[in-house]
Amino acid sequence: MLRSMWNFLKRHKKKCIFLGTVLGGVYILGKYGQKKLREIQEREAAEYIAQARRQYHFESNQRTCNMTVLSMLPTLREALMQQLNSESLTALLKNRPSNKLEIWEDLKIISFTRSIVAVYSTCMLVVLLRVQLNIIGGYIYLDNATVGKNGTSILAPPDVQQQYLSSIQHLLGDGLTELVTVIKQAVQRILGSISLKHSLSLLDLEQKLKEIRTLVEQHRSCWNDKDASKSSLCHYMMPDEETPLAAQAYGLSPRDITTIKLLNETRDMLESPDFSTVLNTCLNRGFSRLLDNMAEFFRPTEQDLQHGNSINSLSSVSLPLAKIIPIVNGQIHSVCSETPSHFVQDLLMMEQVKDFAANVYEAFSTPQQLEK
């Protein structure tokens, strides 16, 4: 039996060698394929886990953004009420002063200015914090993912984070003061000549707000002619000049250099067309919500209904400006409310804001950021 098998192998030696080579090759290729498949599966699993981890970190970061906005609204409201103190004027009016008309005129300008500034500054706060916290969130994610690997140092240590995020004070300080000045001038120009006895409908109010917005948003547009995509409102959120830290160009510490880098990246983001579009969308939603809040006071009376006025018409009910002033004056408590109001919730939950935040986080949480 063995001799016949041996003779068979000798007679078909080349065929057997060829067959053995083929079978061996198939075996080796099979093993190699299994190894590669295992590597691909492991890599895909690692990428999936990393993506899931990054998605979880992003969603957690957005919740932090929302809570931070709500926590800062009382500070914003207090700053506004301090700069535009209408309460002192209403207190004076209760004493029936001889210059009552003059006080009413002042109250008209301050009330409208305060509510309009509240809308602008709240929208700016929402979008600016989205940018800042997603930039720093991206850095923190990279720190958590890479620290200690290959001698990688921390990109954004806690002291840098604190120093960077403190730049929001510009919006709550000098930026807000300048915004108040510009809006007050616009309100004076549009509403200053309108008599307190003159009646306005909700549609009239909407038109006046549009005219005021046009003046405010064109105030610095001539400065931006070279870059039409840049928002004219950036100046109120970050100063045009380099940050005060840049004045320390001699002997900057590594921490200061990192902070300046973060601030410059933020400035670039604020000057982008996407930021301008998102902020403008927020402002449109904000002023629409402001009018919705005031619409409650423009409901037709029984007498209006008897005369056949349309309930749904924005121009069916008109109120004297003197009666509209208290309505406008109280809007700050709805706009700058730290308890989730319809106004703030609308801004925080806008899809455009969410998408923009995701793009910012994506840009600053990728490994390529380490190479910059």
UniProtKB/Swiss-Prot annotation:
Positions of the UniProt region annotated as Targeting to peroxisomes: 1-45
Localization annotation: Peroxisome membrane
GO CC, alphabetical: cytosol; endoplasmic reticulum; peroxisomal membrane; peroxisome; protein-containing complex; protein-lipid complex
GO biological process: peroxisome membrane biogenesis; peroxisome organization; protein import into peroxisome membrane
Annotated segments matching region Interaction with PEX19: 120-136
Predominant subcellular localization, coarse grouping: membrane
Membrane topology: Multi-pass membrane protein
Protein keywords: Membrane, Peroxisome, Peroxisome biogenesis, Transmembrane, Transmembrane helix
Membrane-spanning residues: 16-36, 117-140
UniProt-listed Pfam families: Peroxin-3 (PF04882)
All ranges on the Peroxisomal side of the membrane: 37-116
Topological region Cytoplasmic: 1-15, 141-372
A GO term, aspect molecular function: protein-macromolecule adaptor activity
Protein family per UniProt: Belongs to the peroxin-3 family.
Subunit and interaction comment: Interacts with PEX19.
Role: Involved in peroxisome biosynthesis and integrity. Assembles membrane vesicles before the matrix proteins are translocated. As a docking factor for PEX19, is necessary for the import of peroxisomal membrane proteins in the peroxisomes.
Name of the protein this chain belongs to: Peroxisomal biogenesis factor 3
Taxonomic source organism: Rattus norvegicus (Rat)
